[in-house]
């Protein structure tokens, strides 16, 4: 169980950032993963007063606040029209509606969890994160970065024309994925992200569809855990990428 000594609702990002420089302080998202931890938090920092719970759409991008929920992603008409329903498909099996009403986009992306459907689907698209001090960083680069004491302000999705398919395999519907996969065709290039390896999602790109699935299966490191073996995950990579590419019309 985690214990919190003090709770602060930050009134500015600067205040939140200053508080977050203390290693014993933590920023709260939806509090769904953090509460499962152990130890003591000196100050819990809540960003709920900073207006980061919206999804704003312009002609060329979506700006998704860190405190927007997974349910907001699931129901946003513009976002799902752009992605052909791939974003909704990525989050629909994450536990249940009550959970998705509380889990935040910022927490899901910042955590860079190996099991993250959210990271997997956005990694295949033209996505960026805005960090308070670090500025705007491509999501592919952010996914490889070590965690620090910066603050994720929002996720930015450019409306670069693309077709995308999301698919996953689960042992049961609301469980973590055994393997997650998103494949997009954008700017004449296939972009495939593979998550739940069970490590962080990885992105692969190729101009050719032939042999792409086999290449990813051969080069994406996998490991075994209670949900599946490394060999099973490697097999799933090839199968899921091929299925997604057929749906895109690339095979």
Residue ranges and their predicted role:
Residues 1-251:
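C-terminal structural segment of proteins
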């Amino acid at each position: 169980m985690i214990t919190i000594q003090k709770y602060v609702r930050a009134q500015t990002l600067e205040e939140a950032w200053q508080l977050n420089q203390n290693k014993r302080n933590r920023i709260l998202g939806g509090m769904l993963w953090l509460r499962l931890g152990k130890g003591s938090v000196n100050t819990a920092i809540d960003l709920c007063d900073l207006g980061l719970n919206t999804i704003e759409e312009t002609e060329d991008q979506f700006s998704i606040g860190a405190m927007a929920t997974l349910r907001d992603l699931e129901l946003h008409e513009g976002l799902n029209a752009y992605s052909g329903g791939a974003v909704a498909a990525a989050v629909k099996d994450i536990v249940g509606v009550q959970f998705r009403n509380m889990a935040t986009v910022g927490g899901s992306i910042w955590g860079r969890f190996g099991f993250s459907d959210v990271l997997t689907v956005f990694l295949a698209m033209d996505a960026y994160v805005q960090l308070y001090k670090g500025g705007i960083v491509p999501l592919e680069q952010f996914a490889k970065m070590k965690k620090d004491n910066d603050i994720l302000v929002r996720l930015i999705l450019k409306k670069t024309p693309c077709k995308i398919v999301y698919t996953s395999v689960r042992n049961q519907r609301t469980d973590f994925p055994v393997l997650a996969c998103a494949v997009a065709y954008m700017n004449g290039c296939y972009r495939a992200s593979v998550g739940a390896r069970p490590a962080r999602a990885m992105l692969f790109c190729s101009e050719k569809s032939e042999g792409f699935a086999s290449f990813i299966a051969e080069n994406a490191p996998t490991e075994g855990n209670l949900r599946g073996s490394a060999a099973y995950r490697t097999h799933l990579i090839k199968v899921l990428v091929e299925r997604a590419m057929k749906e895109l019309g690339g095979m």
